Swiss-Prot record:
Name by which UniProt lists this protein: PAB1-binding protein 1
Stated family: Belongs to the ataxin-2 family.
Gene Ontology cellular component annotations, sorted alphabetically: cytoplasm; cytoplasmic stress granule; cytosol
Region described as Disordered: spans on this chain: 201-296, 441-550
Main location: cytoplasm
Keywords: Cytoplasm, Translation regulation
Gene: PBP1
InterPro entries (alphabetical): ATXN2-like (IPR045117), LsmAD_domain (IPR009604), Sm (IPR047575), SM_dom_ATX (IPR025852)
Amino acid sequence: MEGSHSSNMERLEYLYLNLVGQVVQVRLVDDMCVEGLFVACTDVDAETDAGIMICCTRNLASAKRSPLSPSCVNFTDDLFIPYQSIVMIEVQNAKIRTETPGRPDTGRADFSATKFDWADDGVSELLESEPHQTGTWNQFEANEKSFGVKTTYKEEFYTTRLDHSKITEEQRAQADRLAREIESSSTRGIAHRMEREECLHDDEGLDEGQLYSDVHRPQEKKPPYVPPSTGGRKLVNEPPPVPAAAAPATAPTTAPAAAPAPAAAPPAAAPAAAAPPPPPAATSMADDGSMRHKRMNEDPHHMQYDANQTAAGFNPAAAPYTPMKPGAAVPVVDFLASLADAISNNDMCYDCEPHWPGMCNLFYDQDDSSYSQQNYEAAAMPPSHSMNMHMYVNSQPNIPNAHRGYQGPLGRVPHNQSMPMHHMQGQGFHHEMHHHQAFHGMGNYSSQHHNPPIQEYAPHKGQQGVVSRPGMRQGKGGGASRVEPQQPVSANTASSPPPVPTVDSAPNEVKPPAKLQRGRGMAAFTKGDMDGDSGATTNATGGPKKRVGK
């Protein structure tokens, strides 16, 4: 009875404990499936509320629930499900073990551990504890005695075969003496001392790398390094210096050779002639001293031509080399001064024309077209057209000062220069003169047909309009369909002023509405013919024409 109770109830309770916190799917008797987190359970024998408790529940898709229903998408609160409504509880990835990991009874509990001795007890002793006898044990004899294997080893295969009968007693005694010296001598390193079992006292302050890893080599005492210089240390094979007393002894031998020098010689040559040449031995020693900083096995290589030759007494701390000006002895100090001097002394330098204007900033442009030349002539002409055109040779009246300065010595611009365009003539000079008239630029004006500038005004009603000049665009008909640009007005003050506009005294209630009429030139307002009289008013401000009438 007790065994059956523990066999069922305890296993079920253990299963419920492993399901706590796991995601479970509970299938109910009404063919619904609910998913949630397992929280708790009650006893099966409880009188009331016997079941399980799950939280964060939602309904899964089934025959009664569609996948898009709110109960399948949204999570609800805790849900209590009684045992009588549960068909099956399904859980995935649940770890259920009846044994605790690491317990000794989880494996083969039926067999006991058996001790196995691989060797005798005496094998555990150290090799150093056994007594050693040098020279008495032979491996070949031991193998032959124990295993019956006879060796084929011969010493002659690995070394030179010696004939002991030819070795004398003196050689044997010498070999024994050297062997005793080697064996009794001190070791050369730490490794030898450790091989000979010479224990080190507290490792003698050496680290592990120095004891076992480093390679120890004998330290040779080398002289300290001396940097190369002219006054460096003395070489081993350097010849001894010449005594100081030898120099005056050689001076009288060369003095008579310099005595017959002429008196007219320059002062700078006297010290050079008086200085005796050094002896060959001293020259070679000086060369050795100057080349002392170079390598001993390097031969000096001299170039055929050196642009920067270094003197014998070269001083690195001296002022840098300054290039000399060709043909002079003064160094080039000021680059701008030398450049200006070179330009002024150059005969092939470009020479501009002497009459080029210095006030070219007064002109907007330099136009050499026929329009600019013709307009310039028209602007330079006086108001009276009866004067002779050839009288203006050296000076021209009514010319701006800027153009006066631009004229050549003969009154006109040179033939290889273009006529400038003045800013006062920039609006109407392209439309007032005939195209491509003859122009003479050698000092005089040629006979040309000039049309005087005409002031345009709006024609009065009943009068004929102004005759169009050459070069003007003709209208399309009596009534133009578009507004043409207003022609520029010449600055000629000799033309008659425009008439004064009349005052319209008609009452406002009698005036018909004004109509817009488009035309060319000046615009005017025209009043309708009410009483048989015709009148016209001119608008000085310009604009489209307006006609008033029925």
